[in-house]
């Protein structure tokens, strides 16, 4: 049996998803789907010793990163409007942009895993919880060239509509 699994992917620019998997400054944005997309689900556990490798360094995701190409760069792990989600023991690396971006997630556990992105990769934050409740970030090793953890309260469109910040967070 294989003890370690490595998932690699390079999303095609022709694959456009109609869901909003990400946002920027509180505005929902269209983006390409990342390797792991958790949307409107509950009771999800992703655990093990495997690696989610976005392999972004071998594509053109970091060339002109502020230019939209059909849709914006994906997050490695996108979570939207979900509840009771746990990531445990995995490694996530070489993200296209922000590595883990939960939006409106309740009861989120990010436990004992690794995030590895090159120090010169543009805007590849580690973890960016946005408007989440009851979040625990414990034992996570983050090696990136940008923000390790950036707590966000949706502003602009979502902030004006929902007035929701991050609450009850343990780091």
Predicted regions and their residues:
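Short, small-residue-biased leader/transition segments that mark boundaries at the very start
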Residues: 2-7
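Short, charged, surface-exposed secondary-structure boundary motifs
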Residues: 8-15, 111, 160-161
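Extracellular beta-strand/beta-solenoid scaffold signature
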Residues: 15-36, 60-77, 94-98, 121-128, ...
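Sequence/structural signature of small/polar-enriched beta-strand/turn repeats
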Residues: 37-38, 52, 56
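Right-handed parallel beta-helix
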Residues: 42-51, 83-94, 106-117, 125, ...
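Ligand-site clamp/hinge motif
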Residues: 80
